[in-house]
Amino acid sequence: GVGTVMGAKRLKAIVVRGGQKPAIADADKFKDVQDRVMGQFRETHKDTPPPLRVNGTANTVAIAQAFGVLPTKNFQQGTFDKWENIQASTLRDTLVVGNKACYSCPIGCGRLTKVTQPEFAGEGEGPEYETIYSMGSNCAIDNLSAVTKANYICNELGLDTITMGSTVACAMELYERGYITRKEVGFPLKWGDGHALVKLTKMTGEMKGFGRDLALGSYRLAQKYGHPELAMVSKKQEFAGYDPRAEQGMGLAYATSPIGASHMRGDPAYFEILGIPTLLDPLEWKGRAKWVKVCQDLSAIIDASGICIFFTMRALVEQKMEMRPFGIRDYLEAVTGFDYTIEELAQVAERIINAERLFLVRAGLNRKSDTLPHRLTHEPIPDGPGKGYVCHLEEMLDEYYKEQQWTVNGVPSDKKLKQLGLT
């Protein structure tokens, strides 16, 4: 992608500076919509602040632990026995020094933190839940100071924290099984070693020593040492912090995401563990494809609109999965000057999903690419509420392709493409 091209050219950034304000088709309508939306928001939270403002995304640690979906030791387990040391309240009470919000945001989900433990000292933003999972429980590390320091390094060097933590977790399992040794790494690499995490993160950013291998990402790292099955990836991208053996819909979302495993292209956690708009059994796979498709469609609309997913996704799902609440349609109409029906917005979402799928098909991807590691589909999760379960991906794919009106091999049908004007 573009990132690869920029990296090859050693291009660090592209800066665009405009001299004009963006035009709004109907400024008065936009103000009315904004007043209404913010009024609803203030009314909803008149007695209690938004949970994301209080604890940020780290709230998810306790929820994931309770549902047995907190990835631990490179997805060998779904619960972490030292989870309380990395939960939101621990972060808040020991490291958080303030909140951070995007411009004019009423939520303020960001965390400003400061680490005083000498060997990990520093200050900055984060960590978010996905960082805490990937560098914490997934590496069996319960030292939040170490996790936060590694997070700072990633922020400064432009590294993705999910990929970084997951790749270290993969390396730790390779080391545990004897597939790599101290000779390759340069020092012992064992579960729970926060100092090793920080050291390897810096080595990766600087492309030094074993860091060069880690910079390959977990798939190519595991492949290099002869065990690609230990890379917890889909389409070679590392997972977000939910074990799909105990959260079936998330497994389908991971496998069918056009960019590889991602919770940002459709997040079934809303109805599988958060109970929005209703709590579905996370262990049930039958009928789950319909809900996953709805989440993916909503995410596509939110991405295309440029509105924050935290502010809109929850609101959209709370309103029975319709694309009308909290003014998303009204915002679009006020800014663009176009009128949108719910049906038109739904078709825009489907057009985005199918156009992306067509790109993948033409690049040679198909059903065989919509996959998960053997561990998640064949090795039952050993702990938590989902103990004994695997992810029923193949069965869900059959349902999903029918919902999308794609072929059994995952190719958009001519009928569907004609319906969307993509022929």
Stretch-by-stretch model annotation:
Residues 1-423:
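Extended C-terminal regions of large enzymes
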